[in-house]
């Protein structure tokens, strides 16, 4: 059996965009820093990394569609933080952001990763933004790097 997988190393000429929501910026700023750290640690050039800021997680799919339609990036890392409150708003935003990102990704067939936190509390979000549970922004970028390499191997 042949195993085909992407490696966690960039060539150095990959152009990557991070789309991040500004809402809950105390969390998303940390996710962005984690993603940037991963990108550079694994061979990426800082001048080939762009940050696109949108108001909230709900707006990520719109920006993703616009960016992918231009065909200028090797991959996109989507980051955000949706924290449950006392109203059903959390359910709507997290569901639509998730579905929107998935639909756009499948439409364009491009390497995209999902690093949008959906947590029950601010404490859980903080834990996933670089404290107890690691940095999910770093992990989303690591997945993107592997996905870009896999995409190349399978002849996309």
Curated annotation (Swiss-Prot):
Record keyword ATP-binding present: no
GO biological process, one term: riboflavin biosynthetic process
One Gene Ontology term, aspect cellular component: cytosol
Catalytic residues in the record: 89 (proton donor)
Functional pathway: Cofactor biosynthesis; riboflavin biosynthesis; riboflavin from 2-hydroxy-3-oxobutyl phosphate and 5-amino-6-(D-ribitylamino)uracil: step 1/2
Coiled-coil region: none
Class of the enzyme per the UniProt entry, highest EC level: transferase
Catalytic activity: (2S)-2-hydroxy-3-oxobutyl phosphate + 5-amino-6-(D-ribitylamino)uracil = 6,7-dimethyl-8-(1-D-ribityl)lumazine + phosphate + 2 H2O + H(+)
Enzyme Commission code: 2.5.1.78
Positions that bind 5-amino-6-(D-ribitylamino)uracil: 23, 57-59, 81-83, 114
Binding site for (2S)-2-hydroxy-3-oxobutyl phosphate: 86-87, 128
GO molecular function annotation: 6,7-dimethyl-8-ribityllumazine synthase activity
InterPro entries, sorted: LS (IPR034964), LS/RS (IPR002180), LS/RS_sf (IPR036467)
One family name in Pfam for this protein: DMRL_synthase
Keywords from the named record: Riboflavin biosynthesis, Transferase
Family: Belongs to the DMRL synthase family.
PANTHER family given in the database record: 6,7-DIMETHYL-8-RIBITYLLUMAZINE SYNTHASE, 6,7-DIMETHYL-8-RIBITYLLUMAZINE SYNTHASE DMRL SYNTHASE LUMAZINE SYNTHASE
Reported function: Catalyzes the formation of 6,7-dimethyl-8-ribityllumazine by condensation of 5-amino-6-(D-ribitylamino)uracil with 3,4-dihydroxy-2-butanone 4-phosphate. This is the penultimate step in the biosynthesis of riboflavin.
Database matches in NCBIfam families: lumazine-synth
This protein's name: 6,7-dimethyl-8-ribityllumazine synthase
Annotated gene: ribH
